[in-house]
Amino acid sequence: MKFTTPISLISLFVSSALAAPTPENEARDAIPVSVSYDPRYDNAGTSMNDVSCSNGVNGLVTKWPTFGSVPGFARIGGAPTIPGWNSPNCGKCYKLQYEQNTIYVTAIDAAPGGFNIATSAMDQLTNGMAVELGRVQATYEEADPSHCASGV
């Protein structure tokens, strides 16, 4: 009996270690964020040269020359994850959730204070109340690019 107790304990520790969550399989928590709108993102003809994600290695202008060429237009805007020009986060897809509404937005510009998205996207997020609300507290997390249809 004395010999089986240490073996049982070793077996318990090994199985516990194998069942422990790893960073790869842990669920990411949504991050609180302020979301506002800017009608300039609703203009399909605006050149991508007018935003932080214009050119450079991570630029989007060669892929999408205008806002309207971004798949999922007008669910686009600035993101707090883009500090400025040529960010590696240019073109990433983000899930925004406000109350029971969820939208997916392609990041094309810098927005240090939170997400700043097209008015029509904000209307989708807030049930048509973008102008009335102006700014809302929501949550965000990076999403699979297929949700934004960006292919990034």
Swiss-Prot record:
Signal peptide: 1-19
GO cellular component: extracellular region
Disulfide cysteine pairs (residue numbers): C53-C90, C93-C148
The protein's name in its UniProt record: Allergen Asp f 15
InterPro entries: Cerato-platanin, RlpA-like_sf
Main location group: secreted
This protein's record includes keyword Magnesium: no
Entry keywords, A to Z: Allergen, Disulfide bond, Secreted, Signal
Compartment annotation: Secreted
Similarity remark: Belongs to the cerato-platanin family.
Domain of life: Eukaryota
